Amino acid sequence: MANDITTTAAWQSLTERYEAFQGTTLRELFQDGGRAEKLSFDAAGLRVDLSKNLLDDAILTDLVALAEQAGLTDRIEAMFRGEHINNTEDRAVLHTALRLPVEESLEVDGQDVAADVHEVLGRMRDFATALRSGAWLGYTGRTIKKVVNIGIGGSDLGPAMATKALRAYATAGITAEFVSNVDPADMVSVLEDLDAESTLFVIASKTFTTQETLANANAAKNWLIEQLGSEEAVSKHFVAVSTNAEKVTAFGINPENMFGFWDWVGGRYSVDSAVGLSLMAVIGPRDFMRFLGGFRAMDEHFRYTDFGQNVPVLMALLSVWYTDFFGAETHAVLPYSEDLSRFAAYLQQLTMESNGKSVRRDGSPVTTGTGEIYWGEPGTNGQHAFFQLIHQGTRLIPADFIGFARPKQDLPAGEKSMHDLLMSNFFAQTKVLAFGKTAEEIAAEGVDDNLINHKVMPGNRPTTTILAEELTPAVLGALIALYEHIVFVQGVIWDINSFDQWGVELGKQQASDLAPAVSGEVEVDSGDSSTDALIRWYRTNR
């Protein structure tokens, strides 16, 4: 039986402090004029202000003690050393090795994984350079102007998010589209705007057997052959991110144009592996290496900084505090940047696929809450959609606000700047969420008595503010690594395996089992009357 975190002295102390903290307000806590300075930290190009969170010095001390009593130091080192911390699959967890500098080595299971990483990176760099320079030509001799990434889950969400986030760095005239859904509308909507002669497809599937990805890949292949009139065109317009050379070759892709990655990289942690090939094609090798540098800077902060100053550790501990003591179930991520409009969707897989678990590493039931629901939209759009619930609803929703000092583009707003207007909203929201507005303050403004309670803003809504000078490749890498490490720390505290995803597997198996009945090849007999009736209705109305 695993050690139970709820039996530790730190957890017991936090339980008592939670009770004593009830009724404490952020207004009271900010009577300490040094609070913002004490609870603001710099990490890998990010400025992180934790001062608008619901904690005092004693709670912070206990949270740090909780991390220590959970054995976090040893678990961090075990991950970075390549120990098999993914115990249910007996694998190392080494996404951090994807951004090791070329001069370092890391031997795991008798293999220098750093050398392997840089061998693939070198091939990616050569390929992206050929593509961007025009040395790589399509079947008819045209240069490539459009890259279409076909993948799903981690083979889609990461590169799609990052390519949009770093659109300002797309300087070679190559743009990217992303197809993930097996719904044919996804593929059709992309194909209808493509010029086959100048399009390259990147098929991202480690095993080259992923059902949705292969369905889309074959649809793209058939379209290309129809457009260009020859199966020989496939090798000039398709490359693979995979390790299955046999299936890649059978598809028609030259195995020399196959870029591999390893079983110690989970899909949701793979954007900085060969899965990022489409991103490298768009932004170029130099900026892709800067992207990796941002990851590495956050890795070093996480590995070597004391827990009391360690941003991923502190943010993870706060999430445990809200989940297990305040009963919070969701966590909002609110980037005030349209370029980060896909960041919350990316984090949904990273966080919920990792920590959506109900048993501990030894298979025993958890004794805590686990796995917050992550969600969000860019500001200021969210302000006109769901902020009402965060401000005045009955649910506690911790939120991360992400903003930048300098935009990549700006426009005037009268005599002012649109970016300044955006950030004025950013700062106003965290202020109002923290401090609210009392009935007395509203009454002093002459508001009708019957409206006062409707206008009261209770405040005490916790937020974390994350700022950077601008959204660069390095900053994006640091931001992604920040949340990767938050997920890891949460998993250590809850004693769950953050690196498997057994909950995804059964649904895929059932879909394969039901496919013949859904397509009408066999009689419907799913084993339950509801599913049978639904499939029959579908077949009748097909």
UniProtKB/Swiss-Prot annotation:
* EC identifiers of the protein: 5.3.1.9
Against NCBIfam families, the record matches this protein to: PRK00179.1
Catalytic activity entry: alpha-D-glucose 6-phosphate = beta-D-fructose 6-phosphate
**Protein's name in the database:** Glucose-6-phosphate isomerase
What is the enzyme's class at the highest EC level?
isomerase
State what this protein does.
Catalyzes the reversible isomerization of glucose-6-phosphate to fructose-6-phosphate.
Major subcellular location class: cytoplasm
Q: Under the GO molecular function aspect, what terms does this record hold? A: carbohydrate derivative binding; glucose-6-phosphate isomerase activity; monosaccharide binding
The record's family statement is: Belongs to the GPI family.
Q: Which residues form the active site?
A: E353 (proton donor), H384, K508
**Which InterPro entries did the record assign?**
G6P_Isomerase, G6P_Isomerase_C, Phosphoglucose_isomerase_CS, SIS_dom_sf, SIS_PGI_1, SIS_PGI_2
Q: Name one GO cellular component term.
A: cytosol
What does the UniProt entry say about where the protein is found?
Cytoplasm
Pathway connected to this protein: Carbohydrate biosynthesis; gluconeogenesis; Carbohydrate degradation; glycolysis; D-glyceraldehyde 3-phosphate and glycerone phosphate from D-glucose: step 2/4
UniProt entry keywords in alphabetical sequence = Cytoplasm, Gluconeogenesis, Glycolysis, Isomerase
Tell me which SUPFAM superfamilies the record gives.
SIS domain
One annotated GO biological process: glycolytic process
